[in-house]
Curated annotation (Swiss-Prot):
Name of the protein described by the UniProt record: Gap junction beta-2 protein
Organism: Ovis aries
Compartments reported by the entry: Cell membrane; Cell junction, Gap junction
Cytoplasmic membrane side: 14-20, 95-135, 211-226
Family: Belongs to the connexin family. Beta-type (group I) subfamily.
S-S pairs: C53-C180, C60-C174, C64-C169
Keyword rRNA processing: no
Chief location: membrane
Function according to Swiss-Prot or TrEMBL: Structural component of gap junctions. Gap junctions are dodecameric channels that connect the cytoplasm of adjoining cells. They are formed by the docking of two hexameric hemichannels, one from each cell membrane. Small molecules and ions diffuse from one cell to a neighboring cell via the central pore.
Length: 226
């Protein structure tokens, strides 16, 4: 998967984010996408080929692998990153729509006094207020939901975050209970715990930013005259 397009889009969103949001984006790309692209694929590249079971029964190895690893860690992480990044794309769409409306009004001569030219509209930093505040805050809320949901899925699907060295399988067509051995279990456990820890950090950053936006919103309301 090519992550450069996603990085370009989210980089545009980063211009309109809070300081906490910029830290979140840095953590997302450096500690998650880069690790996933550069390191994790090397560790999980041999997962099915080196999944060995002590039986020659045709199909038994494939069935056992599918039973214990219904979805590859790499693919589930990639899916998680897509879901977590999608709400930020809503902010990018909102900003694009805002600028489009500003350009349309400028061309029609409705806001000639606010901007010198269209280039100034393109370079304008959009403040997180009004309808954009709701879009931005909603995107953070859904990011927290997606992060927590995927952490729960990881824990339930793989029966914890530690990779077992030995698993026992008695699924059909295995003739009896067979022993299957996982390749690089310790290394995979380290990567899994690291990715889960980074997910937890992202949740903490998102919750902090959400609280910051809510406090700023409430303080702004209280300053308005009754």
């Amino acid at each position: 998967m090519d992550w450069s397009a996603l990085q370009t889009i989210l980089g545009g969103v980063n211009k309109h984010s809070t300081s906490i949001g910029k830290i979140w984006l840095t953590v997302l790309f450096i500690f998650r996408i880069m690790i996933l692209v550069v390191a994790a694929k090397e560790v999980w590249g041999d997962e099915q080929a080196d999944f060995v079971c002590n039986t020659l029964q045709p199909g038994c190895k494939n069935v056992c692998y599918d039973h214990y690893f219904p979805i590859s860690h790499i693919r589930l992480w990639a899916l998680q990153l897509i879901f977590v990044s999608t709400p930020a794309l809503l902010v990018a769409m909102h900003v694009a729509y805002y600028r489009h409306e500003k350009k349309r009004k400028f061309i029609r001569g409705e806001i000639k006094t606010e901007f010198k030219d269209i280039e100034e509209i393109k370079n304008q930093k959009v403040r997180i207020e009004g309808s954009l505040w709701w879009t931005y805050t909603g995107s953070i809320f859904f990011r927290v939901i997606f992060e927590a949901a995927f952490m729960y899925v990881f824990y339930v699907m793989y029966d914890g975050f530690a990779m077992q060295r030995l698993v026992k399988c008695n699924a059909w067509p295995c003739p009896n209970t067979v022993d299957c051995f996982v390749s690089r279990p310790t290394e995979k456990t380290v990567f899994t715990v690291f990715m889960i820890a980074v997910s937890g950090i992202c949740i903490l950053l998102n919750v902090t930013e959400l609280c910051y936006l809510l406090i700023r919103f409430c303080s702004g309301k209280s300053k308005k005259p009754v």
